[in-house]
Every structure is written in C-alpha cells, then in structure tokens.
Amino acid sequence: MRAMVQVAREPAWVVGGAVRDRALGRPTDDYDVAVQGDARHLARALARSAGAHAFPLSEAFGVWRVVDRERRWQVDVLPIIGGSIEQDLGGRDFTVNAMAEPLGGEGAYVDPFGGLADLRERRLRMVSAGAFVEDPLRTLRLARLACELGFSVDETTMAAARAGAAALAQVAPERIFAELKRIVIADRALDGLALMDAVGATDVVLPELSRMRGVEQSLYHHLDVYEHTRSVLAEVIALERSPGEWLGEYAEAVSRFLAEPLANELTRGQALRFGALLHDAAKPQTRRVTPEGRVTFIGHDAAGAELAAGVLTRLRASERLREHVAALARHHLRLGFMVHEVPLERRSIYRYLSACEPVQVDVTLLSVADRLATRGRGSEEAIRRHLELARVLLGEALAWRDERPRPPLRGDELARAVGLRPGRELGRILAELEEASFAGEISSRDQAIALARELVSPD
C-alpha cells in the first residue's frame, strides 16, 4: 500500500473486504483499490514500484490485477463506477463491504450505508434491494461471509436472498465453485451450509445434497442421510482440529498429511470435506426396503463415485479433484466390511491398500468420520472395533505412502527369469509377487522366481 500511495496520481480509495478486515483486526493479503481515473496506469506503476506483475483482469470493466511475484499479496485496481466514491459503493453487495478508506489512510472512512455500525453488531445487511438481482452469486457470498466472519443476517436481507436464490442457476459454475469452496473449508462450514439451505441455495447449486433430506436409514443410523452427511462433515472437521483424540500416535503424521496441497487450491484435508459431503450422494437413488422391512443402499458406493465426479465436473473442478473425491466415495465402505475379518491377514491389508491407492490414508480417515457419525443401535462397540482397525490400517497406509512395497526383482528381471514378454501376464505375476512380499511369504530373488514359475499360466 505504501508503494501505491507513492505512485498514485489521482484520488484513490481502498474499498471492500480489505477495509472490512482492517476494521475487524483481521489480516488480509487481498486488496481492492478504486481509482478516479485510469486503473491501468496505477496498476502498472504499482507493479514497477513493487517488482510485481500487472495484467488486465476484465477489459470490459477496466479492472487490472497486480500480483506479487511470490504471490504473497494481490491488488485489484478498478475505476470508480459513477461520479463519486459514494455512488461506487452503492453498487456493492453488503454494507460491511461498502466502505472505503482514502489510499494512504489519511481521512475518514467513507461509509454511506452504515457498514461500521453493522460490523459492531456483527450483522450482514444488503446495500440495496436490488443487490441479489444485480449479481445472484451474492446469495452464496452471503452464506460464505456469514460463516467466515461468524455474523448474523438481517431479516430483510435473508428474504431478498431467498427470493433471488433461483437465479444462481444463471451464474457461471466457476464462480459458484469459488464461493462454495470457501464455505466448505471455513471453520463454521456447517453454519454456512445451513444458511445455504435456509435461503434455498443448496437446491440450486448442490441438489444432490438436498435430495438426501428425509431419506431414512437402517437401525444402525440415528439420522437421515442429510443429517448424517452433516455429521460426517463435522467429524472430519474435528479430526482436522484434534486428530490425537482418535488417532493416537498417528496424529502428527495425519496433521502433516491433511495440510498437503492437493488440487484447486485445496489441501487434502479440505478435499476430504468434499468427500464427506458427497460420499453418500447416491443413497437416495439406491434406497430399497426388503420384504422384511430392512433398509438397504446396495451399490451406493460405486454410484456415489460417479455422482460425486459429476457434481465436481459441473462445478468445473480439476480432474484431479474429481478423481480424488470419486475415489473416496467408491472406497468408503471397505474398512467397515473388514471389521468382520479381524484379525487381518497381511494379504487382506495389502488388498485394501492396493485397491484404495492413492487415497488409502484419506479414505481411512473418512471411514473413521463416517463411523463416528453413525450412532444407532449397538453403536458403541461397533465404533470401538472400527477405530481399532482404522488405526492399524492408517499406520499401514502411512508406511505404504512413504515407501510403496516392491517385489524382490524388477519386471525386466522377472521376464528373463521366466521367459515372458512384457504384457498383461507379466503385470499380473508382478502384482502377485508384490502381494506375497508384503505378506512376508517371500523375501529373496530366488523365492520370487520360484513363485513366479508356479504362477505362469500353462497356455
């Protein structure tokens, strides 16, 4: 900001979220600056002065972005709309975002709509009756700001958001996903999702979630599918915050793991939240009741993987995130089925890790959250057994991730030893050797070759 003050030739103001966050004492690295003149000149001058990069963000609106080369901060420079800063602020979404501070901080806040008073009351209020008509995305932004800031929403604004929610269908999917991500990864994500429900936004942007409402489950569940899904998300968030409560010696390793970047500017922990939201997405369409009255959801894991991928495709998420969340849905039942096989053979552990690769750790954590959120009949003993197995598999998954098991010889060596050409048969035998090695059944090259010769198909 000091650099911008030095290069500004025309009146300019810091506006929007940066002013709000400064008033709240919150750190920010994202600034909007409204200039009464040429935004391009100010952006380029700032870039030269700060050793940053400037480029046009919207040529139609004359908006330029300046980004620090190390991506520590960014500034969007935009021309004032209307004849004055007050008129410009009148086109903004909420009063807490409709404040301006003269560049350099000399002079009073420009606050024509009572944003400071709303900050003190921790309240979100629209600037004008047309706020949601001008940009329907503001309905989602309302939920996002409410959960990020912990603010309430005044009744008139809630009513206007509810009236405008259907128009979210007209908003570009990329913009919807940008807001939805911030809601899902917020500390108060459940509050944000509840507000989305209250204004009708969920029905438009995540109808798969809405369809879970009222879908009753078996006696082993104490909640319908929708409330169970919210509870699984709550357990995932709790695991992020305090992994030691359930994961014991693996807590530190899990914390590091969840902090790793994955895709779409999400960490693995944040992507796991999307897995929690979508892992049971296919339950409404797979629900059946047997003649004995038992509720089943056969195939909801495979169908859910397809549905989860479809949701994220619609939102224009990256291929990596789509595949990741789909894999979580596909494999989230595996651990639960294995509880009945305890004590596990090494081959069973190998097959679990191999089948779930590369989401072994992620899906094990999702399974823990899923089990903790299932507290129907006989749940206490079931949870104890599930967590006991989960800790075993989590340790194995973390070790696998550090060093994937390998057979005692390479593929080319095996091909020469048993006289096979590269192809499907050789790949099958290598996989068998890897499993046998993991199980401790072979450890030397000679043992591997002997087993391979037994495994070669006679034809």
Give the ranges of each region predicted by the language model.
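Catalytic cores of the polymerase beta-like nucleotidyltransferase superfamily
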Residues: 1-459
